[in-house]
Protein backbone atom coordinates (compact mmCIF):
# COMPACT_ATOMS: atom_id res chain seq x y z
CA UNK A 1 0.00 0.00 0.00
CA UNK A 2 1.27 3.49 -0.89
CA UNK A 3 0.67 6.84 0.79
CA UNK A 4 -1.56 7.87 -2.13
CA UNK A 5 -3.67 4.77 -1.47
CA UNK A 6 -4.25 6.18 2.03
CA UNK A 7 -5.50 9.48 0.58
CA UNK A 8 -2.31 11.53 0.84
CA UNK A 9 -1.86 14.21 -1.85
CA UNK A 10 0.44 13.35 -4.76
CA UNK A 11 2.80 16.28 -4.05
CA UNK A 12 3.21 15.03 -0.47
CA UNK A 13 3.69 11.43 -1.56
CA UNK A 14 6.50 12.68 -3.82
CA UNK A 15 8.01 14.64 -0.93
CA UNK A 16 7.96 11.49 1.21
CA UNK A 17 9.59 9.50 -1.58
CA UNK A 18 12.33 12.14 -1.83
CA UNK A 19 12.99 11.48 1.88
CA UNK A 20 13.24 7.72 1.07
CA UNK A 21 9.89 7.06 2.77
CA UNK A 22 7.88 4.87 0.40
CA UNK A 23 5.76 2.48 2.47
CA UNK A 24 3.48 3.56 5.33
CA UNK A 25 4.16 2.10 8.77
CA UNK A 26 1.40 0.44 10.79
CA UNK A 27 0.54 3.60 12.74
CA UNK A 28 0.45 5.62 9.51
CA UNK A 29 -1.75 3.10 7.67
CA UNK A 30 -4.11 2.93 10.63
CA UNK A 31 -4.50 6.65 11.34
CA UNK A 32 -4.10 8.64 8.10
CA UNK A 33 -7.36 7.54 6.39
CA UNK A 34 -9.39 8.05 9.58
CA UNK A 35 -7.97 11.53 10.16
CA UNK A 36 -8.64 12.46 6.52
CA UNK A 37 -12.25 11.30 6.95
CA UNK A 38 -12.78 13.69 9.86
CA UNK A 39 -12.28 11.51 12.93
CA UNK A 40 -10.61 12.74 16.08
CA UNK A 41 -7.82 10.24 16.62
CA UNK A 42 -5.78 8.64 19.39
CA UNK A 43 -2.66 6.98 18.00
CA UNK A 44 -0.42 4.82 20.16
CA UNK A 45 2.92 3.51 18.89
CA UNK A 46 6.44 3.19 20.21
CA UNK A 47 9.15 5.75 19.52
CA UNK A 48 10.55 5.51 16.00
CA UNK A 49 7.35 4.11 14.46
CA UNK A 50 6.51 7.18 12.35
CA UNK A 51 3.93 8.93 14.54
CA UNK A 52 4.87 12.41 13.29
CA UNK A 53 4.08 11.54 9.66
CA UNK A 54 0.88 9.82 10.84
CA UNK A 55 -0.51 13.22 11.82
CA UNK A 56 1.55 15.50 9.55
CA UNK A 57 0.51 13.78 6.28
CA UNK A 58 -3.27 14.26 6.67
CA UNK A 59 -2.80 17.78 8.04
CA UNK A 60 -0.60 18.81 5.12
CA UNK A 61 -2.89 17.12 2.59
CA UNK A 62 -5.91 19.09 3.77
CA UNK A 63 -3.94 22.30 4.30
CA UNK A 64 -2.75 22.25 0.68
CA UNK A 65 -6.38 22.34 -0.48
CA UNK A 66 -7.05 25.57 1.42
CA UNK A 67 -3.80 27.10 2.78
CA UNK A 68 -5.15 29.94 4.92
CA UNK A 69 -4.04 31.37 8.28
CA UNK A 70 -2.88 29.09 11.07
CA UNK A 71 -4.18 25.71 9.90
CA UNK A 72 -2.79 23.50 12.65
CA UNK A 73 -1.29 23.63 16.14
CA UNK A 74 0.99 20.88 17.48
CA UNK A 75 1.72 20.88 21.21
CA UNK A 76 4.59 18.80 22.56
CA UNK A 77 6.26 18.64 26.00
CA UNK A 78 9.87 19.58 25.16
CA UNK A 79 11.69 22.13 23.04
CA UNK A 80 13.75 19.47 21.27
CA UNK A 81 10.65 17.56 20.20
CA UNK A 82 9.07 20.80 18.94
CA UNK A 83 12.15 21.58 16.83
CA UNK A 84 12.27 18.02 15.50
CA UNK A 85 8.59 18.06 14.50
CA UNK A 86 9.04 21.46 12.85
CA UNK A 87 11.97 20.12 10.82
CA UNK A 88 9.78 17.29 9.48
CA UNK A 89 6.94 19.65 8.58
CA UNK A 90 9.40 21.98 6.85
CA UNK A 91 10.98 19.14 4.86
CA UNK A 92 7.61 17.73 3.80
CA UNK A 93 6.12 21.09 2.86
CA UNK A 94 9.17 22.70 1.25
CA UNK A 95 7.74 22.51 -2.28
CA UNK A 96 4.57 24.28 -1.12
CA UNK A 97 6.32 27.24 0.58
CA UNK A 98 5.05 26.17 3.97
CA UNK A 99 5.44 28.64 6.85
CA UNK A 100 6.05 27.24 10.32
CA UNK A 101 6.54 28.96 13.66
CA UNK A 102 8.24 27.20 16.56
CA UNK A 103 7.10 28.65 19.89
CA UNK A 104 9.28 27.33 22.73
CA UNK A 105 11.07 28.66 25.77
CA UNK A 106 14.67 29.82 25.55
CA UNK A 107 14.10 31.73 22.30
CA UNK A 108 13.37 35.41 21.58
CA UNK A 109 9.85 36.18 22.83
CA UNK A 110 9.37 39.27 20.66
CA UNK A 111 10.49 37.44 17.51
CA UNK A 112 7.95 34.71 18.25
CA UNK A 113 5.25 37.36 18.74
CA UNK A 114 5.96 38.84 15.32
CA UNK A 115 5.92 35.37 13.70
CA UNK A 116 2.54 34.56 15.24
CA UNK A 117 1.14 37.89 14.07
CA UNK A 118 2.05 36.92 10.49
CA UNK A 119 -0.23 33.85 10.77
CA UNK A 120 2.10 30.97 9.80
CA UNK A 121 0.47 27.84 8.41
CA UNK A 122 1.49 25.67 11.36
CA UNK A 123 2.53 26.42 14.93
CA UNK A 124 4.64 23.87 16.81
CA UNK A 125 4.81 24.81 20.49
CA UNK A 126 5.44 23.82 24.06
CA UNK A 127 2.41 24.59 26.24
CA UNK A 128 4.25 26.85 28.68
CA UNK A 129 5.62 29.29 26.12
CA UNK A 130 2.38 29.38 24.10
CA UNK A 131 0.45 30.05 27.31
CA UNK A 132 2.81 32.99 27.98
CA UNK A 133 1.96 34.46 24.58
CA UNK A 134 -1.76 33.98 25.16
CA UNK A 135 -1.46 35.76 28.50
CA UNK A 136 0.85 38.57 27.46
CA UNK A 137 1.13 39.15 23.71
CA UNK A 138 -2.29 40.53 22.83
CA UNK A 139 -5.15 39.60 20.53
CA UNK A 140 -3.26 40.39 17.33
CA UNK A 141 -0.75 37.67 18.20
CA UNK A 142 -3.17 34.92 19.16
CA UNK A 143 -6.11 35.67 16.84
CA UNK A 144 -4.93 33.11 14.27
CA UNK A 145 -5.20 30.33 16.86
CA UNK A 146 -8.94 30.95 17.15
CA UNK A 147 -9.50 29.50 13.66
CA UNK A 148 -7.25 26.44 13.55
CA UNK A 149 -8.57 23.28 11.93
CA UNK A 150 -6.26 20.78 13.67
CA UNK A 151 -4.92 20.38 17.19
CA UNK A 152 -2.31 17.67 17.85
CA UNK A 153 -1.03 16.65 21.28
CA UNK A 154 2.26 14.83 20.76
CA UNK A 155 3.41 12.65 23.69
CA UNK A 156 -0.15 13.10 24.94
CA UNK A 157 0.33 11.11 28.15
CA UNK A 158 2.95 13.63 29.30
CA UNK A 159 0.89 16.63 28.26
CA UNK A 160 -2.20 15.35 30.08
CA UNK A 161 -0.28 14.93 33.34
CA UNK A 162 -0.75 17.45 36.15
CA UNK A 163 2.45 19.34 35.36
CA UNK A 164 1.01 20.77 32.13
CA UNK A 165 -2.59 21.22 33.31
CA UNK A 166 -2.72 25.00 33.76
CA UNK A 167 -0.79 25.80 30.59
CA UNK A 168 -2.89 23.41 28.49
CA UNK A 169 -6.09 24.92 29.82
CA UNK A 170 -4.90 28.39 28.82
CA UNK A 171 -3.92 27.14 25.34
CA UNK A 172 -7.31 25.47 24.84
CA UNK A 173 -9.10 28.65 25.93
CA UNK A 174 -8.28 30.43 22.65
CA UNK A 175 -8.86 27.50 20.29
CA UNK A 176 -12.10 26.73 18.44
CA UNK A 177 -14.47 24.40 20.34
CA UNK A 178 -13.92 20.69 19.77
CA UNK A 179 -16.81 20.42 17.29
CA UNK A 180 -15.09 22.95 15.01
CA UNK A 181 -11.63 21.37 14.93
CA UNK A 182 -10.04 17.95 14.67
CA UNK A 183 -8.07 16.78 17.68
CA UNK A 184 -5.37 14.10 17.43
CA UNK A 185 -3.46 12.61 20.35
CA UNK A 186 -0.30 10.59 19.73
CA UNK A 187 1.79 8.83 22.33
CA UNK A 188 4.06 5.88 23.01
CA UNK A 189 2.13 5.20 26.23
CA UNK A 190 -1.66 4.99 25.97
CA UNK A 191 -2.49 5.62 29.63
CA UNK A 192 -5.93 5.18 31.20
CA UNK A 193 -6.37 8.97 31.05
CA UNK A 194 -5.67 8.96 27.30
CA UNK A 195 -7.80 5.87 26.62
CA UNK A 196 -10.72 7.36 28.57
CA UNK A 197 -10.99 10.14 26.00
CA UNK A 198 -12.21 7.58 23.47
CA UNK A 199 -15.24 6.83 25.64
CA UNK A 200 -16.42 10.43 25.68
CA UNK A 201 -19.41 11.10 23.40
CA UNK A 202 -18.24 12.75 20.15
CA UNK A 203 -18.98 16.44 19.61
CA UNK A 204 -22.23 17.13 17.80
CA UNK A 205 -21.97 16.28 14.11
CA UNK A 206 -18.61 14.49 14.46
CA UNK A 207 -17.83 10.78 14.04
CA UNK A 208 -16.64 8.77 17.09
CA UNK A 209 -13.06 9.11 18.32
CA UNK A 210 -10.79 6.56 16.62
CA UNK A 211 -8.18 4.69 18.69
CA UNK A 212 -5.33 2.82 17.01
CA UNK A 213 -2.55 1.17 19.03
CA UNK A 214 0.58 -0.41 17.58
CA UNK A 215 3.17 -1.79 19.99
CA UNK A 216 2.76 0.86 22.68
CA UNK A 217 4.61 0.73 25.99
CA UNK A 218 1.59 -1.08 27.46
CA UNK A 219 1.82 -3.79 24.80
CA UNK A 220 5.58 -4.17 24.34
CA UNK A 221 7.77 -3.70 27.39
CA UNK A 222 11.39 -4.50 26.56
CA UNK A 223 12.83 -5.68 23.21
CA UNK A 224 14.43 -9.11 23.28
CA UNK A 225 17.61 -7.55 21.84
CA UNK A 226 18.04 -5.30 24.91
CA UNK A 227 20.29 -6.47 27.73
CA UNK A 228 19.30 -4.96 31.11
CA UNK A 229 21.88 -5.08 33.90
CA UNK A 230 22.55 -3.37 37.22
CA UNK A 231 25.29 -2.53 39.68
CA UNK A 232 24.53 -2.04 43.39
CA UNK A 233 26.63 0.75 44.88
CA UNK A 234 26.92 3.09 47.87
CA UNK A 235 25.25 6.37 46.85
CA UNK A 236 28.34 8.50 47.64
CA UNK A 237 30.53 6.75 45.02
CA UNK A 238 28.08 6.45 42.12
CA UNK A 239 30.31 8.59 39.88
CA UNK A 240 33.28 6.24 40.39
CA UNK A 241 31.18 3.23 39.37
CA UNK A 242 29.91 5.14 36.34
CA UNK A 243 33.52 5.86 35.35
CA UNK A 244 34.33 2.15 35.59
CA UNK A 245 31.25 1.15 33.57
CA UNK A 246 32.10 3.54 30.74
CA UNK A 247 35.67 2.15 30.58
CA UNK A 248 34.68 -1.51 30.31
CA UNK A 249 35.99 -3.05 27.06
CA UNK A 250 32.45 -3.69 25.76
CA UNK A 251 31.40 -0.06 26.40
CA UNK A 252 34.55 2.03 25.95
CA UNK A 253 33.63 2.98 22.37
CA UNK A 254 29.83 2.86 22.72
CA UNK A 255 27.61 5.87 22.16
CA UNK A 256 25.84 6.32 25.47
CA UNK A 257 23.02 8.31 27.04
CA UNK A 258 23.26 8.76 30.82
CA UNK A 259 19.94 9.66 32.45
CA UNK A 260 19.73 11.68 35.66
CA UNK A 261 16.79 13.10 37.60
CA UNK A 262 18.07 16.62 38.33
CA UNK A 263 19.70 19.38 36.31
CA UNK A 264 22.37 19.93 38.98
CA UNK A 265 23.37 16.25 38.75
CA UNK A 266 23.62 16.59 34.96
CA UNK A 267 25.99 19.55 35.33
CA UNK A 268 28.15 17.83 37.97
CA UNK A 269 28.46 14.72 35.78
CA UNK A 270 29.21 16.74 32.64
CA UNK A 271 32.11 18.52 34.31
CA UNK A 272 33.36 15.42 36.13
CA UNK A 273 33.38 13.18 33.06
CA UNK A 274 35.00 15.89 30.96
CA UNK A 275 37.84 16.11 33.49
CA UNK A 276 38.15 12.33 33.18
CA UNK A 277 38.67 12.87 29.41
CA UNK A 278 35.33 11.59 28.16
CA UNK A 279 33.73 13.37 25.18
CA UNK A 280 30.45 14.49 26.72
CA UNK A 281 27.51 16.78 26.07
CA UNK A 282 24.52 17.49 28.29
CA UNK A 283 20.84 18.19 27.81
CA UNK A 284 18.53 19.60 30.48
CA UNK A 285 15.89 22.26 30.99
CA UNK A 286 18.16 24.89 32.58
CA UNK A 287 20.39 25.18 29.49
CA UNK A 288 19.80 27.97 26.95
CA UNK A 289 18.09 26.62 23.85
CA UNK A 290 21.12 27.26 21.63
CA UNK A 291 23.27 25.08 23.93
CA UNK A 292 20.61 22.35 24.03
CA UNK A 293 20.43 22.26 20.24
CA UNK A 294 24.22 22.23 19.98
CA UNK A 295 24.48 19.32 22.43
CA UNK A 296 22.07 17.17 20.43
CA UNK A 297 23.86 18.01 17.18
CA UNK A 298 27.29 17.19 18.67
CA UNK A 299 26.01 13.85 19.93
CA UNK A 300 24.37 12.97 16.62
CA UNK A 301 27.54 13.90 14.72
CA UNK A 302 29.77 11.83 17.01
CA UNK A 303 31.67 14.82 18.40
CA UNK A 304 30.39 13.74 21.81
CA UNK A 305 30.28 10.02 22.63
CA UNK A 306 28.19 10.51 25.77
CA UNK A 307 25.03 12.55 26.31
CA UNK A 308 24.07 13.30 29.92
CA UNK A 309 20.38 14.10 30.07
CA UNK A 310 17.31 14.52 32.19
CA UNK A 311 14.08 12.98 30.90
CA UNK A 312 13.80 15.65 28.17
CA UNK A 313 15.77 13.12 26.08
CA UNK A 314 13.80 10.01 26.99
CA UNK A 315 11.01 10.45 24.44
CA UNK A 316 10.65 11.03 20.77
CA UNK A 317 14.02 12.60 20.01
CA UNK A 318 15.54 11.29 16.81
CA UNK A 319 18.90 10.12 18.14
CA UNK A 320 19.96 7.07 16.11
CA UNK A 321 22.40 4.34 17.11
CA UNK A 322 22.53 4.72 20.89
CA UNK A 323 24.38 1.61 22.03
CA UNK A 324 24.27 2.05 25.80
CA UNK A 325 21.82 3.65 28.24
CA UNK A 326 22.90 4.23 31.83
CA UNK A 327 20.36 5.10 34.53
CA UNK A 328 22.54 7.08 36.94
CA UNK A 329 19.37 7.98 38.84
CA UNK A 330 16.23 5.83 38.98
CA UNK A 331 12.99 7.38 37.68
CA UNK A 332 9.95 7.36 39.97
CA UNK A 333 7.63 6.16 37.19
CA UNK A 334 8.41 2.70 35.72
CA UNK A 335 7.13 3.87 32.32
CA UNK A 336 9.86 6.53 32.31
CA UNK A 337 12.38 3.71 32.76
CA UNK A 338 10.91 1.99 29.68
CA UNK A 339 11.16 5.21 27.67
CA UNK A 340 14.76 5.72 28.77
CA UNK A 341 16.04 2.25 27.91
CA UNK A 342 14.03 2.46 24.70
CA UNK A 343 16.64 4.89 23.38
CA UNK A 344 18.74 1.83 22.52
CA UNK A 345 18.03 -1.57 20.88
CA UNK A 346 15.84 0.10 18.27
CA UNK A 347 14.79 -1.26 14.86
CA UNK A 348 15.96 -4.77 15.74
CA UNK A 349 19.47 -3.71 16.79
CA UNK A 350 21.02 -4.93 20.03
CA UNK A 351 21.63 -2.57 22.94
CA UNK A 352 22.59 -2.43 26.60
CA UNK A 353 21.06 -0.68 29.59
CA UNK A 354 22.87 -0.46 32.92
CA UNK A 355 21.15 0.84 36.04
CA UNK A 356 23.17 2.13 39.00
CA UNK A 357 21.23 1.19 42.13
CA UNK A 358 21.86 2.77 45.53
CA UNK A 359 20.36 1.68 48.82
CA UNK A 360 17.41 4.13 48.60
CA UNK A 361 16.36 2.81 45.16
CA UNK A 362 15.21 -0.70 46.11
CA UNK A 363 11.47 0.03 46.07
CA UNK A 364 11.67 1.76 42.69
CA UNK A 365 13.59 -1.15 41.18
CA UNK A 366 10.97 -3.59 42.43
CA UNK A 367 8.24 -1.52 40.73
CA UNK A 368 10.23 -1.37 37.49
CA UNK A 369 10.90 -5.12 37.40
CA UNK A 370 7.22 -5.81 38.05
CA UNK A 371 6.26 -3.40 35.25
CA UNK A 372 8.62 -4.88 32.64
CA UNK A 373 8.07 -8.45 33.87
CA UNK A 374 11.79 -9.04 33.85
CA UNK A 375 14.60 -9.24 36.41
CA UNK A 376 17.74 -7.20 35.85
CA UNK A 377 21.01 -9.11 35.75
CA UNK A 378 24.12 -8.19 37.70
CA UNK A 379 26.89 -6.52 35.69
CA UNK A 380 29.65 -8.75 37.02
CA UNK A 381 32.56 -6.99 35.33
CA UNK A 382 32.34 -4.02 37.71
CA UNK A 383 33.45 -5.02 41.21
CA UNK A 384 34.15 -3.01 44.35
CA UNK A 385 37.85 -3.89 44.10
CA UNK A 386 38.14 -2.79 40.46
CA UNK A 387 36.44 0.53 41.21
CA UNK A 388 38.70 1.21 44.21
CA UNK A 389 41.80 0.30 42.20
CA UNK A 390 41.00 1.96 38.89
CA UNK A 391 38.46 4.75 39.36
CA UNK A 392 37.81 5.98 42.88
CA UNK A 393 40.66 8.44 43.42
CA UNK A 394 40.60 10.06 39.97
CA UNK A 395 36.81 10.34 40.01
CA UNK A 396 36.73 11.83 43.51
CA UNK A 397 39.27 14.49 42.53
CA UNK A 398 37.39 15.33 39.32
CA UNK A 399 34.06 15.58 41.15
CA UNK A 400 35.52 17.77 43.91
CA UNK A 401 37.04 20.13 41.33
CA UNK A 402 33.72 20.26 39.46
CA UNK A 403 31.76 21.12 42.61
CA UNK A 404 34.28 23.84 43.50
CA UNK A 405 33.96 25.33 40.01
CA UNK A 406 30.18 25.32 40.21
CA UNK A 407 30.31 26.95 43.63
CA UNK A 408 32.73 29.61 42.35
CA UNK A 409 30.47 30.27 39.35
CA UNK A 410 27.37 30.42 41.59
CA UNK A 411 25.68 27.74 39.49
CA UNK A 412 22.63 27.48 41.76
CA UNK A 413 22.33 31.27 42.05
CA UNK A 414 22.48 31.64 38.25
CA UNK A 415 19.48 29.36 37.97
CA UNK A 416 17.55 31.55 40.42
CA UNK A 417 18.61 34.70 38.54
CA UNK A 418 17.53 33.22 35.20
CA UNK A 419 14.13 32.36 36.65
CA UNK A 420 13.80 35.92 37.97
CA UNK A 421 14.78 37.30 34.56
CA UNK A 422 12.08 35.23 32.90
CA UNK A 423 9.60 36.59 35.41
CA UNK A 424 10.72 40.18 34.76
CA UNK A 425 10.43 39.70 31.00
CA UNK A 426 6.86 38.51 31.45
CA UNK A 427 6.10 41.50 33.67
CA UNK A 428 7.59 43.92 31.09
CA UNK A 429 5.38 42.40 28.40
CA UNK A 430 2.34 42.87 30.65
CA UNK A 431 3.24 46.53 31.22
CA UNK A 432 3.73 47.20 27.49
CA UNK A 433 0.43 45.48 26.71
CA UNK A 434 -1.36 47.53 29.38
CA UNK A 435 0.05 50.79 27.98
CA UNK A 436 -1.07 49.83 24.47
CA UNK A 437 -4.59 49.14 25.70
CA UNK A 438 -4.70 52.47 27.53
CA UNK A 439 -3.47 54.29 24.40
CA UNK A 440 -6.16 52.64 22.27
CA UNK A 441 -8.81 53.55 24.83
CA UNK A 442 -7.75 57.21 24.97
CA UNK A 443 -7.74 57.42 21.15
CA UNK A 444 -11.29 56.06 21.02
CA UNK A 445 -12.36 58.68 23.53
Swiss-Prot record:
Residues 247-387 form the Helicase C-terminal domain. SMART domains: DEXDc, HELICc. Residues 431-445 have a biased composition (Basic residues). A motif (Q motif) lies at residues 1-29. ATP binds at residues 45-52. GO terms for molecular function: ATP binding; ATP hydrolysis activity; RNA binding; RNA helicase activity. Pfam families: DEAD (PF00270), Helicase_C (PF00271). CDD domains: DEADc_DDX49 (cd17955), SF2_C_DEAD (cd18787). It is found in: Nucleus, Nucleolus. GO terms for cellular component: cytosol; nucleolus; small-subunit processome. Keywords: ATP-binding, Helicase, Hydrolase, Nucleotide-binding, Nucleus, Ribosome biogenesis, RNA-binding, rRNA processing. A motif (DEAD box) lies at residues 154-157. PROSITE patterns: DEAD_ATP_HELICASE, HELICASE_ATP_BIND_1, HELICASE_CTER, Q_MOTIF. The keyword Hydrolase applies. One of its GO terms (biological process) is endonucleolytic cleavage in 5'-ETS of tricistronic rRNA transcript (SSU-rRNA, 5.8S rRNA, LSU-rRNA). Its EC number is 3.6.4.13. Its main location: nucleus. Residues 32-208 form the Helicase ATP-binding domain. Residues 408-445 are annotated as: Disordered. ATP-binding RNA helicase involved in 40S ribosomal subunit biogenesis and is required for the normal formation of 18S rRNAs through pre-rRNA processing at A0, A1 and A2 sites. Required for vegetative growth. Belongs to the DEAD box helicase family. DDX49/DBP8 subfamily. The Q motif is unique to and characteristic of the DEAD box family of RNA helicases and controls ATP binding and hydrolysis. This is ATP-dependent RNA helicase DBP8. The lineage of its organism: Eukaryota, Fungi, Dikarya, Ascomycota, Saccharomycotina.
Amino acid sequence: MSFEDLGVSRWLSEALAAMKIHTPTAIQSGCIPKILSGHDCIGGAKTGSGKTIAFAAPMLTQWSEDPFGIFGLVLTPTRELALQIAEQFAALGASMNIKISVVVGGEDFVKQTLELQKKPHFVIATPGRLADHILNSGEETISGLRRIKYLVLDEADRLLSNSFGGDLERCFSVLPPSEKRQTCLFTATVTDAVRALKEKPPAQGKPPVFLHEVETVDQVAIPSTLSIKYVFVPSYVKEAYLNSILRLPQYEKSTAVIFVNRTTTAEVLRRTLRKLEFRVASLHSEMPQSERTNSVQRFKAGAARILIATDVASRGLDIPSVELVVNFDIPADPDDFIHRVGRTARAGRSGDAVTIIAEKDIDRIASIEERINKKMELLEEVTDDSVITDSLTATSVAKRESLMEMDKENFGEKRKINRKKRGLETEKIRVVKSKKEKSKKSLRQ
